[in-house]
């Protein structure tokens, strides 16, 4: 669905009116397109932590141009499209001043749609209390910058565990690219990869890999299938038998296979096991299928409660368990679930949905350590307001509020969720597990 306000304030007349009366002026986000340069350019590298050499290696591999950082003594107005600050060596409160000085001197140099990444050491990996406090303080800085910089600029914090330096590349590539246009203010933890350092074709990272996507006949599920196929995957598109016609169209559009399966059926696990026995194991499984049955809990029927939990939570749990126990996932496999901002913040009239999506977060956090023994990662995305057929049915004023209540002042697109899932499912993302990444433009809900 089109965003009329976004189009209006970016027209010549609308821009003048918005400036005159002080209306928000969000910029249309620049998203990745095939054939475009992968990373922002040029990018400032600053900080002197243990990750600086790895960042420079990644920049060299991606032809990213490093730019000179401005300082308080040597200011500069030359525009840049990104900044990476390695704060992994910050060990006390005094050293936090280095971040103030850097961002104070360089914030105005960041161009529209720029990407900012701060690298740190997670507090649980710090050597003492002063270091742990200083590293935890980075979260407040990053979330504040994400709200202050505006102009479609995004800001993230990546905590990299000691020894996990080689796990950084896929995450840094993602957060410095247009693929992460609607992800901002996020904190991601990297540990040592569960499956080593595989050889990667960065143009077609899923080449030779098989992916299963549920709820794939339309909307976000279709976008996920399209992005995975674009990046080389053979995609099995799953949806309920009632959606067979649109499912077959979706599968055909990505050169994949349509499989009509009710994931809540009593024999769904047996059907999955039979499919794997006939066709082979998967490398990527995306639990996207979900439903809503909105009512306040006082008015909600038992059937509405149970059906939402069955589709959104029970089915992903049962299918994931069957895949892990029954050799349905290859080593180096990826499970990605779809949670929601509602699962983090709750929502009026969605107690069933919020319960199910909070449960998905519990599934990810609980299953990740178990899956690691099989060299499999488990993660989730938590979308905010995404422009879909479902959100198009929301009453106008509520829909507009949902669009504007984030730092980017607009709704996301299904491809924003799909690109984030593709990063989590990436063969080089073995160091990312047990994480829940919001795709919400830094929504005020649950902040």
Task: Report the location of each language-model feature.
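Short C-terminal tail/terminal secondary-structure segment
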Residues: 185-207, 345, 433-447
């Amino acid at each position: 669905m089109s965003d009329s306000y976004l189009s209006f304030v970016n027209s010549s007349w609308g821009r003048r009116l918005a400036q005159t009366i002080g209306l928000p002026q969000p910029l249309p986000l620049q998203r990745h397109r095939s054939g475009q340069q992968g990373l922002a350019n040029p990018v400032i590298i600053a900080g002197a932590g243990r990750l600086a050499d790895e960042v420079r290696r990644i920049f060299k591999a991606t032809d990213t141009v490093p730019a000179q950082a401005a300082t308080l003594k040597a200011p500069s107005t030359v525009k840049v499209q990104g900044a990476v600050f390695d704060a992994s060596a910050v060990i006390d409160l005094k050293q936090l001043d280095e971040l103030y000085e850097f961002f104070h001197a360089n914030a105005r140099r960041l161009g529209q749609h720029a990407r900012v990444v701060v690298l740190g050491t997670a507090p649980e990996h710090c050597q003492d209390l002063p270091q742990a406090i200083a590293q935890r303080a980075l979260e407040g800085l990053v979330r504040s910058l994400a709200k202050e910089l505006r102009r479609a600029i995004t800001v993230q914090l990546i905590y990299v565990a000691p020894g996990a330096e080689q796990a950084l590349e896929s995450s840094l590539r993602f957060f410095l690219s247009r693929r992460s246009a609607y992800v901002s203010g996020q904190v991601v933890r990297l540990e040592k990869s569960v499956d080593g350092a595989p050889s990667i074709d960065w143009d077609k990272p899923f080449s030779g890999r098989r992916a299963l996507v549920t709820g794939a006949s339309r909307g976000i599920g279709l976008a996920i299938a399209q992005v995975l196929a674009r990046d080389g995957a053979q995609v099995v598109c799953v949806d309920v038998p009632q959606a067979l016609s649109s499912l077959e169209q979706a599968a055909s559009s990505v050169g994949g296979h349509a499989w009509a399966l009710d994931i809540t059926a009593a024999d769904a696990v047996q059907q999955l096991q039979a499919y794997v026995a006939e066709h082979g194991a998967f490398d990527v499984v995306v639990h996207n299928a979900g439903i809503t049955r909105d009512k306040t809990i006082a008015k909600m029927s038992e059937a509405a409660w149970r059906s939402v939990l069955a589709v959104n939570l029970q089915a992903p749990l049962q299918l994931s368990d069957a895949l892990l126990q029954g050799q349905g996932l290859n080593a180096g496999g990826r499970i990605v679930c779809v949670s929601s901002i509602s699962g983090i913040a709750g929502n009026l009239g969605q107690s069933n949905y919020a319960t199910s999506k909070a449960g998905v977060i519990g599934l990810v956090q609980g299953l990740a350590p178990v899956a690691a023994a099989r060299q499999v990662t488990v993660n989730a995305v938590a979308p905010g307001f995404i422009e879909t057929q479902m959100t198009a049915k929301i009453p106008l004023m509520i829909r507009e509020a949902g669009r504007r209540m984030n730092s980017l002042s607009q709704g996301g697109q299904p491809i924003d969720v799909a690109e984030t899932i593709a990063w989590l499912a990436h063969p080089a993302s073995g160091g990312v597990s047990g994480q829940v990444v919001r795709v919400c433009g830094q929504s005020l809900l649950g902040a």
